[in-house]
Amino acid sequence: MDHFLKLLPKLTPQLRKGDCGKIAVIGGSLEYTGAPYYAASSVSRLGADLIHVFCAPDAAPVIKGYSPDLIVHPGMNASSILPKLNRMDAIVVGPGLGRNPTLWPLLQEIFNFVKNEKVPFVIDGDGLWFVSEHIEHFPRQMVTTVLTPNIVEFSRLCKSALGEEDVLNVKSSSQLQHLAAELSRKMDVTIYMKGEVDLVVTPNGEVSKCSTDSSLRRCGGQGDVTAGSLGLFLYWAKKNLGDDWTSAHHEAGISSSWLVRTAGRRAFEKHGRSMNTPLLLDEIPKLVRDVETREMKDTVHSDSSKH
């Protein structure tokens, strides 16, 4: 919780619209409209000011209908997306993206944009599938980038980048951590590996872990909430830490892990096996408020102790 609390920007009368975050989510297809919504909605509930969703034309009306808070852009072509990315504070690519091969050139342009402009960047879901399929073309020195694989996505990345064929059968947590460190070094990016214990591994070998109790329900969409919240936290961490991307990735990664695991646990405690991702999202505003209220109480207690 302390990592999360450190990242929350102070709300003051001097803030302007956009100061707390302008975030882009790139994903959404005919089949998958929930994933980009979950990623974007998590960002909205955490307090980002402007959330843009870039999606396939077939997905746009559906995503628009989910929430009036989101700015939805239909069309998945570089000429329309890249100029708008110049205004974004962080980019999340992959939730509900789909695997249409025609998307790969767009992703290559986005990767190059991120590398050159050093924008906080998260690759999740189908974005990771494309990276696995085109590992030899993934750029080096993507210093702002975090990959967020689950175990299946992690196994694909390890097979493509490291030649490891049997990762799904690895049971040892220390061996998985070793593979995550090898993958991070080989790809020169941070790996946020989701699992029973979440790992954040940076290319220099540093490892952070989060084992906060989480939901026992493994419903779809929790990874999208992780990706969205991580994107916003990366921006907030950058504001606090400047270009110290290693520290920013650890602070943001552990904050995202704690948030999603805690919100999921609260939702599961209330709803049991009926818990789903919308119910998890509903817990985020309450969780943020609880953290801020605790901070205010601690501050008042500290001030009182001085007199």
UniProtKB/Swiss-Prot annotation:
Catalytic function, reaction form: (6S)-NADHX + ATP = ADP + phosphate + NADH + H(+); (6S)-NADPHX + ATP = ADP + phosphate + NADPH + H(+)
Single Gene Ontology BP annotation: nicotinamide nucleotide metabolic process
Pfam family for this entry, one: Carb_kinase
Domain YjeF C-terminal: 1-291
Entry keyword annotation includes Nucleotide-binding: yes
Domain of life: Eukaryota
Annotated GO MF terms: ATP binding; ATP-dependent NAD(P)H-hydrate dehydratase activity
Coiled coil, from the record: none
Assigned keywords, A-Z: ATP-binding, Lyase, NAD, NADP, Nucleotide-binding, Phosphoprotein
Protein's recorded name: ATP-dependent (S)-NAD(P)H-hydrate dehydratase
Function: Catalyzes the dehydration of the S-form of NAD(P)HX at the expense of ATP, which is converted to ADP. Together with NAD(P)HX epimerase, which catalyzes the epimerization of the S- and R-forms, the enzyme allows the repair of both epimers of NAD(P)HX, a damaged form of NAD(P)H that is a result of enzymatic or heat-dependent hydration.
EC number: 4.2.1.93
EC top class, as a word: lyase
Cofactor: Mg(2+)
InterPro entries: Carbohydrate_kinase_pred_CS (IPR017953), CARKD (IPR000631), Ribokinase-like (IPR029056)
Taxonomy of the source species: Eukaryota, Metazoa, Ecdysozoa, Nematoda, Chromadorea
Protein source organism: Caenorhabditis briggsae
PROSITE patterns: YJEF_C_1, YJEF_C_2, YJEF_C_3
TM segment ranges: none
Family from the record: Belongs to the NnrD/CARKD family.
Claim: Phosphoprotein is one of the keywords in the record: yes
Binding sites annotated in the UniProt record for (6S)-NADPHX: G96, N150, I151, V152, E153, F154, S155, R156, D224
Residues that coordinate or bind ATP: 194-198, 214-223
